[in-house]
A protein has these predicted regions:
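Extracellular/secretory-pathway and virion-surface proteins
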Residues: 1-85, 92-98, 106-365
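Short Cys/His-rich micro-motifs in 6-15 aa windows
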Residues: 101
Length: 365
């Protein structure tokens, strides 16, 4: 995809085979530019080509998954650790004390992470890259087609800093079978836009959309440094699962509202998905112009909550700079409901509904 703009490129995967069992993960350790270099960038895009290999190592739609799947890219920090062994502890005592039991060696141990150490001072053998993983990008795979997407994920420049070695982790639900090409494009634009400098993880993970949903997403406190120029809330929110006719609940083909309240109501904002009830939104010209792969099979045309099959999920970004307390703690509250007409209803429990409704949500400041 050539946009005509000049950019620097970081290659994560280059026509690499991605396969394995259900929801297999593939990882790649990448050496990133220095913090000084990263500070020059104000825009970042991710270019994904998820080709489906044929028997000759080429590309063919015939080799693609026939269903829509969630695909995610995470970037993970590295951290120094030490392993402590407890040779006198039995398995029951070990587990009771919160340690881990090595069944092959028959010994109790715990992993202790050490703050403030660099890779150089820690050493490769005591360094774990797979720590503090932040979802960086999200896609929904198409029905039986090969997707190519170019997505603006500029806020996540902050996750690259301070540079050096970082672990990228890609995971797709289902049975993966891809020739994976993934590259970051970094732009040094001559503008007054500040470069994203740091991030603070907020809510993450996939949680059942039921009467306990709000309890599983408690209010979170975050601190804003004194020297910030801009503060943004960034999130990926998509609904999945539909239950059945006896459950009166769904998260994929039904609208839901996600409500955020900053510092006790100083600023409120919300995200909803009115297109989720549409019979044809995902095959509309509007959706295709926003990145949906056309002419798929299956039920690709139905509207969904925050996504379509064969589409890159755009990050939800809200500028909250004017409403945070600079240099002190802030609190963000989050609630969600199922939208029915003009009503905002608590989603009921799923019970025996099949694919129970759930919200896949990751966010950061």
């Amino acid at each position: 995809m050539d946009t005509g703009e000049e950019y620097d490129e970081i290659i994560i995967y280059d026509e690499e085979i991605y396969t394995g069992g259900w929801a297999a993960t593939t990882t790649k350790l990448v050496e990133l530019p220095s913090d000084e270099q990263l500070q020059q960038y104000t825009k970042m895009e991710i270019d994904l080509l998820r080709g489906c290999p044929d028997g000759n190592g080429g590309y063919s739609d015939a080799g693609c998954d026939e269903y829509d799947r969630i695909a995610r890219l995470y970037i993970c920090e590295g951290q120094c650790f030490e392993t402590q062994y407890f040779p006198d502890a039995d398995e029951a005592t070990c587990i009771e004390n919160g340690s881990s039991w090595d069944s092959e060696q028959g010994i109790c141990f715990s992993i202790n992470y050490i703050e403030g150490e660099s890779l150089e001072s820690c050493g490769e053998e005591n360094w774990n890259y797979n720590r503090d993983c932040q979802e960086m990008s999200r896609w929904i795979t198409p029905f039986g087609r090969q997707p190519r997407h170019l997505t603006d994920i500029s806020p996540f420049i902050s996750t690259l800093r301070p540079g050096g070695p970082k672990l990228f982790k890609f995971q797709e639900s289902g049975w993966p079978n891809s020739l994976l090409t993934m590259k970051l494009r970094l732009y040094n634009e001559t503008s007054t836009e500040p470069s994203p400098n740091d991030h603070y993880p907020m809510w993450s993970g996939t949680v059942g959309f039921n009467s306990d949903y709000d309890e599983n997403r408690p209010p979170l406190v975050f601190e804003v440094p004194d020297d910030v120029e801009r503060v943004e809330f960034v999130a990926y929110i998509t609904g999945h699962g539909w239950g059945n006719n006896t459950c009166y609940n769904c998260a994929e083909f039904c609208n839901s509202k996600h409500m955020f309240s900053l510092n006790g109501g100083v600023y409120d904002f919300e995200k909803s998905f009115p297109n989720a009830a549409s019979n044809d939104y995902c095959m509309s010209l509007e959706a295709i112009s926003e990145g949906v792969i056309p002419n798929q099979g299956g039920t690709w045309g139905y509207g969904r909550a925050g996504w379509c099959p064969g589409q890159d999920v755009k990050p939800y970004i809200v500028d909250i700079t004017d409403y945070v307390e600079i240099g002190s703690e802030n609190i963000l509250d989050y609630d969600a409901c199922r939208v029915s007409g003009n009503s905002c209803l608590t989603p009921p429990s799923c019970g025996t509904c099949g694919y129970c409704p759930e919200i896949a949500f990751s966010s950061c400041i």
